[in-house]
Amino acid sequence: MMKLSKLICPECQAENERNADACRECGHSLGFVNVNLLSDPYFQEGLEERYHAAIANLPGTEVQRFAEIIDREGQAVINMSFEVLRLLVNENEDYLSYQRGVEQGKIVKRTFQHDRFQCIVESAFYGFDGRNLVYAALSLDDNGVSAYGDVSVVLRKKNIEKRTTFFERDTFLLFDDLTEKGWKLKDIIPAGHCGTWRERTKIAAIKHGDQVKAGHQTADFAAMILKNGDERTDDEFIELHIFNKVGPTNFERITFQKKLTTPFERQQFKILKSKLSSLQVGVIEA
């Protein structure tokens, strides 16, 4: 059975398990578990191998230009409802992962079927700490996955890049893909499908390199990397996993994808806009 390498404490040099968050000897913080896991040579080498195989016969100049645009303009975007945004900003609440939200009584537990599947998938990829991850999508035009709400929130890169990992697609769909190909839950997930913030351009190139054409502009790439389908299972995007939580201080700008029509919504929008302005969060109206 494949085993990950040990994590060395930078303070006392003690060996720790790769999924440790604090040194077992001196208690020194070891960083973010999701990033530490995907920084292991097993994942790094597997991603590198798949990346080189994917781009071997592709036009290098065009793929490089695509990667540069992803690196420069790619954003982490979370879509949510107007009501959720209003709660986060007005009450200074945090946007939590599903499992942590349920634990704290802030998110209603889903049906047993959906609740069970989410917990299985998150633990299959990350173990215990799967419960600590907030999901976002990689975007080039500030638009996210509309199925989750009509408000798109762009996060500040400097607040999340050190605690974010990337998967080539929705992890629930990827889970199904891998199990259909024979992956067993007792095994570590196959390498080559995920990485850290540093590898985001390689993941994008693996997934979309063969679609890149000469003359493609940023808008073309934006439509390529994030597609909203008629059903959630039809959505296609590169998924970001942000460790812990995010809140209004992590927001960079917000786009309202539809007009607010009721007097109550318009009044609440004015209040929100004022509070967001005080946090230096940009607001784009539909």
Each predicted region: which residue ranges?
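Residues immediately within or flanking Cys/His clusters that coordinate Zn2+
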Residues: 6, 20
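Active-site-proximal loop/hinge segments that shape catalytic or ion-binding/gating pockets
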Residues: 5, 38-60, 64-69, 73-84, ...
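Short Cys/His-rich micro-motifs in 6-15 aa windows
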Residues: 27-35
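Short, intrinsically disordered linker segments that flank or connect zinc-binding domains
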Residues: 1-2
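Short cysteine-rich clusters marking metal-coordination/redox-active sites
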Residues: 9-12, 23-26
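Extended catalytic/binding region for NAD+/ADP-ribose chemistry, centered on the ART fold
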Residues: 124-147
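Hydrophobic packing positions in secondary structure, especially the a/d seam
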Residues: 86-88
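Cys/His-rich metal-chelating microdomains
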Residues: 15, 19, 29
